Structure formats: C-alpha cells, structure tokens
Regions:
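A short beta-strand element within beta-rich, extracytoplasmic domains
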Residues: 213-237
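Active-site-adjacent mobile loop/cap segments within catalytic or ligand-binding domains
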Residues: 281-284, 301-309, 368, 383-384, ...
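Short beta-strand-plus-loop segments that form exposed binding edges in beta-rich domains
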Residues: 285-296
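Active-site microenvironments of hydrolase-like enzyme catalytic domains
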Residues: 324-422, 454-476
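Pro/Thr/Ser/Gly-rich low-complexity, intrinsically disordered linker/stalk tracts
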Residues: 504-547, 596-614
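Beta-strand-rich modules
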Residues: 576-597
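Helical hinge/lid and interdomain linker segments adjacent to catalytic or ligand-binding clefts
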Residues: 655-787
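A glycine-rich, often tryptophan-bearing local segment used as a flexible ligand/cofactor-contacting loop or short
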Residues: 737-846, 878-879, 883
Length: 894
C-alpha cells in the first residue's frame, strides 16, 4: 500500500505542470560549502582584485571589476539599474533528439499554435532580455538567442577566409598564443566534439592608438538583415579587462570593451546589428590591441548570426535554426566541456538538456566571487531564472490556470556555493509570483497566482547562485493562452519580471534602484524652416512605478538605409535638426533615467528636397499588436490563424502551425483531436510582424518623386492636437493591419471618432488625402462610420475580401504583387478590403479577380486616394516608387 501511494505521488508530480524539471534525482552527497565570512587573507578562487568584502551586502562579497561586455559608444550612464550585473535567463526546452524514437522532436506538445519550446522565447527574447540589457545588465542565455538562420564564422585557422581575415601589425605583432582555441573543422559535429579545442588563438601585447595592431573580420553576409555578433578569445594570466572591439554595421561604428580576464574559450555576445548583403568594410568587426593597461589582447573566431543547428545525433541534425534547439546543443557549439551537456553520454538528451541550462551557468560563473568553489570562466553571474509555461486547465473552459514559481532550499545543507542561504532563492521565487500577480491584475484584471513550490527541480537545484523557475501560465489552457499570445500581455509580464529582478538584485547588494521608463508618445517631426525640423515627443507615466520617470531622452538616427547610430542625449522633450538635402533621415527616441532606457518609439522619417514648396505629412496609424483571431463558441475555442494570424512585435519564432482541433470536450486529450492541437507547418520560420518602421517605406517612395519635403508623425500626435493636418498640402495616413478586432487587450481602431472628425475637417479645407490599410473599411461597422467611409473617403464596403490566390494588382499602367501570406520578409495583408466607389469616385487599382483595390476621388473640393491594402505590402521597391509617383501626380495636381 505504501509503495502504491508513493507511486501515485510521484506520477502526480511528474504530470503536474510543464514537467521540464519533473525528474527526481537522487540526492547528491552533502559537501562543505565555502563560507561567505572571509578572513583578511582569504579570498574566493579567481578573485584577484575584482572582489571586496561588503558587510552590508547579503552576498558578503561584491564584484567590483569591469563588466564582461560594455558598449563604449552609447552615451548613457546607468547608476541605479543593473549595470555591472551579470544574469542568466533562459527560455524553456527546445528541439531535442529522442534516442528511443530516433528522431528530433519538441519537448512539449503543439498546442494553440505554439509549443512551450517556442512560446517562452517570445517573452524572453523579444521583451525580457532587452529590458534587462536596457537596465545595464549583461545577460547570458543557454539557448541561442539570435532568430537568424544564417551564420558566418571568420577564424584565423581557416585560411580560405582570406581576405575576410586580415592582420595588421603595428608596434606589437600578432602571434600564436600557445593555447587551444576555436576552429571550424567540419560542417556538423558529433557528440563530444569541441570546436574550441581544435584551433589556435592570436595574441598581441597592448599598445597606444598610434602604434595599434588590428585584426579585421569581414564576413560575406548571405542576406541583408540583423545578425548577432559573437566574439571569442582566450583568457590568459595577463589578459586585460578592456579589449577593444569595433563593429561596423551598415557603415555605423560601435565600440565595445570586453573584459578578457573572464569568459575565454566560448562565444561572447556583443549585440545584434543590421548588416548589408555581401562583403565590405562597411560590415565587419575590428579587434585592436589598444589599451592603457599593460597586458595582452587575444582574438579567436568571430561569429555573425545564430545559424542552423549543427550538432549531429545518430547521423542527423535537427534541420532547424539553432535558436529553436535545446541548450544541450548550443553548449557543445559554445565550447562547454562534456560534463556540462553530456552527463548521460548521449543516451538521454532530454535529461542532459534540462541539466545543461544550469550547468552552463555554473561553468561560466565558476571561479567568480559568487561561485568561488567551482572552476570555470570567472564570469560573476549572480542570478539564474528559467522561464517556462506550465500544463493544466480548469474544466469550466474560462478560468485562468495562472502562475507558479519554484525554488529549492533543501539541498547542500541549504546553502549555495558562496555560502549564502538558499532562502534567497525562495525570496526571489516568492517575489516573482506576487509581483506578477499584482502587475498583471492591475493591467488586465484579476490574475491567478498559484503557489511557490519549494521542491527538488533541476533548474532550481543545480544553479550555484540564487535561482527560480517561473511557470508563467498554462500552455494547455486556452483562457491562459488568450493572454499569453497577446504581445501587450507579454510586454507587461516581462516588465514585471524585470522589475522583480531589479528589486531582488538591489536588495542583495543593499543598493537603491530606479525602474526604467516607458517609451515616449506623440512622436512627431515638423519642418520649422526650409531645411530644419523640430522633433518632439511626450513622456508616458507608469502609474505602477513612481521611479519610472524619464530624466532625459536618447535620439537615434539612421541615414538613407544605414543602420542606426548609438544615440544622442536630449535633455528636454524636443530638439531641432538641420537636414542635408536628398537624404532620408530616420529617427527613434527612447526615454532614459538612472535605472536605464525604455523601448523605442515607432520609427519616423524626414526628407528635405531642395527647392520644395510643399511638404507631405506621413501619419503612422499602424500600432496594432495582437494574438491570432479568437474563435470561441459554446462547444469550441481556440485561435483561428486562417481568419487572422495576428500581429507580433517584430518577427517571431513562436508559431508551430495553425490550430486544427477546437472541440472543448477534448480538453486535456493528448492527440490530434485534443483541444488546441496544432500543425507544424510554421516551425523553423521567423514570421514578420509589426516593425514600426513603415513611414520609412512611404518616405522612400515619396522621395523618388523628387519634388517634396517629407515629415512624419504618430497618429497619436494628430489625435492629441500636437500636429495640425491643415498645415500640410497632402497627408499620407498609413494604417497597415490596424483594426479594432474585439479581442486584443488594447483597442486599435482604424478611424476613431476624433480621427474621423479631423479628416473630415481636413478634406473640407481642400486637403489631399492618401489612406492605405487592410481594414480601413471592414473596421467601420456602425451607421456613422459607414457614413464617414461614403462621404469622406468616397468608398463603400460589402464585406468582400479577394481570394488569397490573388497576389497581383493592376492599374495605373502597371501591375505588381503584394504580400498575401505570412512570411519572413514582411508582414502580410491576408484579408485586404474590396472597395467600391461612391459617387464620382472611381477604381484606380484592381485585385486579380477584377474587384476594387483602390478608389480615387478627383473632386473640386478635395482629392483622395484610398487603398484597401497597405501600400508598404507592395513587394517590389521599384513598383512601390512608381505607384507612389502616380498617386502623387493625381493628388498634387491643381
């Protein structure tokens, strides 16, 4: 009877929740831990001069050296955030090789268009890590973080890369460092092969700028896009803490200092940058030996892009981008010893992957002041967080299952490697649970907080620093996933996690903290002279955080297709700038305080055309972020991606495929008929979302006309009275996928009552109006809204959408294709509106089935051109420009 009871308890524990750590391990032998009470002569292993005793700190010791990686080009000084803090944050699971079934598979089922292996990335990679980095932290994640399938590695050992790898010697020469390093000897690696033990490393003594020595790594980028940059080097006894790396990205220059006293022999993340296709000096990384420190700089391989999985199991790789694989395989590619990722000797990748996440953290942190009793790379990682989703549901089909956190205090006599109590982990887990409940309830109504588990789970037991597992919500519960798939919910949840980490770290070190601000609003650019513009914006108050007030701002600029610079500080909420003629300027703004930096505003653009007498104002009205369409009846529930795939914040790696099973009665059934079951047609694809940069596409097209100045603004600036449309001869209102879908947590009405009034007044005064968007007519359903469509936009709508088989549009003496299906390059207009002319208006463009795509009105009172699809969804750059020139020729004529 006792055995039966024990069996039931264990099975229940294994089945509850996500089960990522639901493997119970035999308790390891207890060991004596190093005390954090150090004598004058005693110091942690590897401490050198980087640590000092701190009696007011919960740690009892502080790291006081240079941060692992510092962006020296960014003019922001963070004093009450997470600067010089090193954190480990990893999304759960990932693709793994199942030896018993001899195939690669997800660790969790495909439900509600995703799987936990994909879903938690969309919180951690898109929101949480950027927030932590904006607060100044260096963040390690054991899974590949770059959503980029391409990868280029340049290494000194591969002479075929010449001239992509070049050395320039000054007073000090580059030579072999006499230690092992990275070499790419093969396309794929079998179990146990370590690329960081197969090559060599270059080294040079430090010098001044005048006598510098350089190594240039110039990749041949296969496709223009954003690529993570990783560097590698060796840590030697006389390594310096400010090795200089210069990243040239689309001609822009960003300088980093890397502390080479730690982290040698693995990939070290610098940042993610825009690179142009091909091989040029505009896109490269330069390592110098410049430093005022007396020592050496080492340099090994440099990697551009996350790449495809290259770890072979039973003769096959996963066939997916590395970022979708489990930590086990990334650890091998990153040079970790087999003890980190291969304890089961290739017999059980599932268990090895679970343990790899924590062992990677310990390997990096070993020898630092926070993990002094282990050998490792001496990176002072001080906190570990595993972000998961759980399993479970309520039979009423409507109640949220909610959030759970996990810690482990009863292990190794209740202390961590440095000697501090494991109760700090419990404090962290408790704060995560209650803080998230408070923040989510304040924003979305009552949120369910389940409990704090103090149990034996791998990712809360193995880390030798304070740690917790956060089970965000249940991926098996549709009421939970209605929240979870909404990008606005993800932002709020991630911000709550970031704030908890901020407060916890500050408490551990007995320091003050300030919460980073929210992004500014009402961003706008207006001409105040023939070649001078004023940029202005307003702060956004965070009612939940009194400290989250901006004290200054950062203005980021890019020129004519180049990458953005590292920002210029602005004290107030406006600035002036002189524009050079015929150059496309793009701008973003962030809010800044002592705690860090906000997310950016939308991207706005400006062009000064020499001799221009008229200015066109581009109004960005596309701010929508949403889950896929929600389908919910008495008997069915789920996401209907065919009706509307939703809009993510930038690209996403979170979709596995469309949901195919909606029957509520099959809740909890693990089969193709089970509620939420989804396909796999989208796995491995990075689906484009809202990049918030479409004013640039419109400005480029207007610029091709060679006649007009271009200004731009957010639609909020128009609706709040900051920008007066009557000041502009022509207005280009882009609405993209904007619509009030009825299920998103933020309403995104195409034409609010206020905007209807403003556009009515603008046209009555003789304005010239261009409007484009997928739902400009279908989103207007009331009688008054239909009257606005008829009387102002001169269009009518009968509920029609062209077949998705039709991607071609004709008219205006040309034809072109638009994005109709979701893809990796640009968001898609899956359901554009079919428009009908009213009165004297006429069809200017037709869909492939002959129905109206655009309606033009050439009145004596005003002129308008209304498109039932987003202008920026025209695929061809040259066609976009030609169509815009034709539209402007029509609108701007007297």
């Amino acid at each position: 009877m006792k055995k039966q009871y024990l069996y039931i308890v264990i099975v229940w524990a294994l089945l509850a929740g996500c089960g990522s750590q639901r493997i119970f391990f035999q308790q390891q032998p207890k060991v004596n831990m190093r005390s954090n009470l150090l004598s004058e002569s005693e110091a942690p292993i590897g401490s050198a001069k980087r640590e000092y005793r701190h009696s007011n700190s919960n740690w009892g010791v502080e790291y006081s050296g240079e941060q692992w990686v510092r962006n020296m080009s960014k003019p922001i000084r963070i004093t009450e955030g997470l600067a010089n803090r090193h954190l480990s944050v990893t999304p759960s699971h990932g693709r793994y090789y199942d030896r018993g079934k001899d195939r690669w598979k997800w660790q969790r089922p495909e439900l509600f268009c995703t799987t936990e292996d994909l879903f938690t990335q969309t919180i951690v990679i898109s929101y949480l890590i950027p927030m932590l980095e904006n607060a100044g932290a260096t963040v390690f994640t054991s899974r590949e973080r770059d959503w980029q399938r391409n990868e280029v590695v340049i290494d000194n050992d591969d002479r075929t890369k010449q001239p992509q790898y070049t050395e320039t010697n000054g007073h000090r020469t580059w030579h072999d460092a006499g230690t092992t390093g990275f070499a790419s000897r093969r396309r794929e690696y079998t179990n146990g092969e370590n690329p960081f033990l197969e090559g060599t490393v270059r080294v040079a003594r430090t010098s001044n700028r005048k006598n510098q020595s350089l190594i240039t790594y110039k990749p041949n980028i296969p496709k223009e896009g954003r690529y993570a940059v990783y560097v590698s080097y060796a840590t030697l006894p006389n390594s310096i803490d400010d090795a200089e790396y210069i990243v040239y990205h689309k001609g822009r220059k960003t300088v980093f200092h890397v502390n080479q006293k730690m982290g040698g022999g693995t990939w070290v993340y610098l940042g993610t940058f825009g690179f142009e296709q091909g091989c040029s000096q505009r896109n490269c990384v330069v390592v110098t030996n410049v430093s005022d420190k007396n020592g050496v700089v080492t340099s090994d391989a440099i990697r551009f892009g996350g790449g495809m999985g290259n770890i072979q199991r039973a003769g096959m790789t996963s066939g997916l981008p590395r970022c979708l694989e489990g930590s086990r395989y990334n650890a091998q590619w990153s040079g970790a010893p087999t003890s980190v990722y291969n304890a089961k000797e290739g017999q059980d990748d599932y268990t090895d992957d679970i343990n790899t996440r924590s062992r990677m953290t310990n390997w990096l942190a070993g020898g630092s002041c926070y993990v002094p009793g282990l050998s490792g790379l001496k990176v002072p990682i001080e906190l570990s967080l595993a972000v998961h989703s759980d399993a479970g549901y309520h039979n009423d089909y409507s109640s949220v299952f909610g959030t759970l956190t996990i810690c482990t205090t009863e292990y190794h006599d209740g202390v961590l490697n440095s000697g501090i109590s494991r109760n700090h982990s419990k404090n962290f887990a408790t704060s995560l649970l209650h803080d998230s409940q408070r923040d989510l309830s304040n924003k979305f109504g009552s949120w369910t907080a389940r409990k704090v588990y103090d149990r034996n789970y791998s990712e809360s037991r193995l880390p030798e620093v304070p740690s917790a597992i956060l089970e965000t919500l249940s991926h098996q519960s549709f009421p939970d996933m209605k929240y979870g798939q909404d990008p606005n919910f993800k932002f709020v949840f991630a911000r709550s996690i970031y704030k908890t980490i901020l407060r916890f770290v500050a408490n551990m070190h007995n320091t003050s903290y300030v919460v980073q601000p929210l992004a500014p609003t009402n961003f706008n650019i207006r001409f105040i002279d023939k070649n001078k513009v004023r940029l202005s914006w307003n702060p956004v108050n965070d009612p939940q955080e009194s400290s989250a007030k901006p004290t200054s701002y950062m203005l980021y600029t890019s020129l004519s297709g180049g990458d953005f610079d590292n920002g210029q500080p602005v004290r107030g909420n406006s600035c002036q700038m002189e524009l050079q003629p015929e150059i496309l300027y793009n701008f973003r703004v962030t809010a800044v305080n002592k705690g860090g930096e906000s997310f950016p505003t939308e991207q706005l653009s400006a062009v000064c055309h020499e001799g221009a007498t008229r200015t066109i104002m581009i109004v960005n009205g596309f701010h929508r972020l949403s889950s896929p369409a929600i389908h919910e009846t008495a008997s069915e529930q789920g996401f209907d991606m065919n009706a509307d795939p939703g809009v993510t914040y930038g690209p996403t790696a979170g979709w596995c495929g469309a949901q195919t099973a909606f029957d509520k009665s099959n809740i909890g059934v693990i089969s193709s008929s089970g509620l939420g079951f989804s396909g796999n047609e989208l796995q491995g694809k990075f689906i484009a979302g809202n990049d918030f940069n479409y004013t640039t596409t419109h400005a480029e097209a207007i610029m091709s006309a060679g006649k007009y100045n271009v200004a731009s603004c957010s639609s909020t600036a128009v609706e709040n009275g900051v920008v007066n449309l009557d000041n502009y001869y022509c207005v280009d209102l882009l609405l993209g996928l904007e619509k009030d879908d009825g299920y998103s947590f933020v309403p995104y009405k195409t034409f609010s009552k206020n905007m209807q009034r403003l556009l009515t007044e603008y046209t009555r005064s003789g304005g010239r109006l261009l409007v484009s968007g997928s739902y400009i007519a279908s989103d207007m359903t009331s009688e008054s809204e239909r009257n606005f469509l008829n009387n102002v936009l001169k269009v009518d709508y009968n509920g029609e959408t062209p077949s998705r088989n039709y991607t071609n549009i004709t008219g205006m003496g040309t034809s072109f294709d638009i994005y109709r299906t979701i893809n990796e390059d640009h968001y898609a207009t899956t359901s554009p509106d079919v428009l009908h002319p009213v009165g004297s208006a006429f069809c200017a463009l037709l869909y492939g089935d002959g129905r109206g795509a655009s309606i033009a009105y050439d009145g004596r009172d005003y002129k308008s051109f209304v498109m039932g699809f987003p202008f920026e969804c025209i695929k061809s750059h040259s066609k976009r420009n030609a169509v815009m020139r034709g539209i402007l020729s029509f609108l701007m004529k007297n």
